[in-house]
Design a protein with these regions (language model features):
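Short capping micro-motif at the N-terminus of alpha-helices
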Residues: 6, 52, 99-100, 174
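Mid-length scaffold segments of soluble, non-membrane domains
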Residues: 74-124
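A broad, low-specificity signal marking well-ordered, structured residues that form hydrophobic/aromatic
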Residues: 21, 50, 82-84, 116, ...
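Bacterial Sec-dependent N-terminal signal peptides
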Residues: 1-26
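Primarily secretory-pathway and cell-envelope proteins
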Residues: 24-75, 124-183
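Residue-level signal for beta-strand positions within conserved beta-sheet cores that form or flank
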Residues: 19, 112, 135
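Short, charged N-terminal helix-start/capping segments
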Residues: 19-39, 86-90, 95-100
Length: 183
């Protein structure tokens, strides 16, 4: 009888401790969640040309120049550097780029076009370890002004496959076409 009670007690303690060990502690929602944009943008079209995955920081009353300093390489988003995947060879800002996945960095400028960089480095946290010798291309991102302030950093591809990056009142555009179709 004592052995049965002891066995049941050991079983109960084991069961209780095993449920505590296996209980998952999920993290809170990231304040700068990841987002993605693709072209074509319709989820019904599976034959994509390009997709970009990036973190979406928010202004929250802060100045864009403090979050993405002028004349310094920026991760183009929050947390990890943005990554862009081309499923086909493209012409990115006038320069041919082979199909593949690249980190997307930018160098903001206050009064001029931004520099947009595709790098072979991948799975990179921020721009802390950016190396210019890993650049595939550097192109000019044309600047325009948004009438409405854009609170969360955003990227999209318009109907012409132009990459648009917007934050605060700044919109940076880089043309993309399929390689061989630039005629």
């Amino acid at each position: 009888m004592k052995k049965s009670i002891l066995a049941i007690a050991i079983f109960a303690i084991t069961l209780i401790s095993s449920t505590e060990i296996s209980a998952q502690k999920f993290p809170k929602l990231d304040l700068s969640p990841l987002d993605a944009a693709s072209y074509p943008s319709s989820y019904k079209i599976s034959d994509k040309v390009v997709k970009v995955v990036y973190g979406r920081p928010q202004l929250k009353g802060r100045d864009l120049a403090k979050l993405a300093p002028n004349d310094k390489v920026w991760r183009t988003g929050a947390n990890e550097a943005a990554e862009i995947t081309f499923y086909k060879d493209v012409v990115f800002g006038g320069k041919v780029v082979k199909a593949g996945t690249y980190s997307l960095f930018t160098i903001p400028a206050s009064e001029a076009d931004w520099t947009v960089i595709l790098s072979t480095a991948r799975n990179v946290w921020g721009s802390y370890f950016y190396k210019q010798d890993e650049d595939v291309v550097r192109v000019s991102g044309k600047i325009s002004t948004s009438e409405k302030s854009i609170e969360a950093f955003s990227m999209l591809f318009d109907k012409n496959m132009t990459l648009k990056m917007g934050w605060e009142n700044t919109v940076v555009s880089v043309s993309i076409t399929l390689a061989g179709s630039e005629d």
